[in-house]
Amino acid sequence: MDRIVSLYWDNVDRRIVEAQRRVFAHFGLAIDQRERTGLRHCDFLDSYMAEVAEDDVALLVDIDCFPLNRAIVDRAFAAARAGRIFGCAQSRNNIDPERLYVAPMFMAISRRTWDRLGRPSFCPDAGNDVAQALHDRAVAAGVEVEMLYPEACVAPKWRLGDFAVFGIGTFYVGGVFHLFQSRRKAYEFILLEVAEATIAGRPIDVLGLIDRALPLRLRDHWVSQFRDWRKAMGLSRVLRRLRRGTPPAPAGARQRAKTEAQ
């Protein structure tokens, strides 16, 4: 059986959940959207893969990710049934951008392949992001991996090796869209508009989305700069006190002094 599943918490905007469901339904596909608030994504994926039947193929999808056509889903399932791992390429953001892997934002894998690899956990560790160790084990075992690479992005944030950049509102070759960082409410309009265009069968106005996102990106930049400045100023005050031989007062003492002054 071909299965499609996504996980979400109760803090995800229900419009995002509904948009994903509607896109899959538009292509004649049912997606099992499971609310498991508080459960780590990797733990959910581990338990889900153990749950599916031996002959099943799973398409693991982030709640803010969906296909832009039916063909890419059929291609993903066909690859997984043939024993391959298929999905969107990602890197560990700014930590290790040269080390690419198929991420479970859009990953097709069969239960047989997962069993063959020894049922590796999807959970991250000090050296790996979610599913990164699974990807490396597959490569070492000779399992063929097919990766889709970004072709456009509304708000670039990270480098993907020497191939491309990705970030908020990324479009992948073949027809996959992933919002990324869906917790950032200001950018939800990107996903909602891409979903509506996909369902309506009209071209996606990527340039228009970029224009609308630009002021948000500039604001994010200056907010980040201000936070860095505040942190630097706080450190400077501590260093000045240490140079004068006056240790910084504990937070509680500062609060008491402030109260007494009032």
Residue spans for each PLM region:
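Short beta-strand-to-loop acidic/aromatic patch adjacent to the donor-nucleotide binding site
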Residues: 55-66
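N-terminal anchoring/stem segment of glycosyltransferases
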Residues: 1-55
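Short, solvent-exposed loop/turn segments at secondary-structure junctions
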Residues: 10-12, 38-39, 64-67, 91-93, ...
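Short, surface-exposed basic-aromatic patches at helix termini and helix-loop junctions that form
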Residues: 22-25, 50-51, 74-81, 140
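Residue-level recognition of beta-strand->loop/alpha-helix junctions
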Residues: 33-35, 89, 149
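Short, high-confidence coil segments that cap the C-terminus of an alpha-helix
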Residues: 55, 82-85, 143
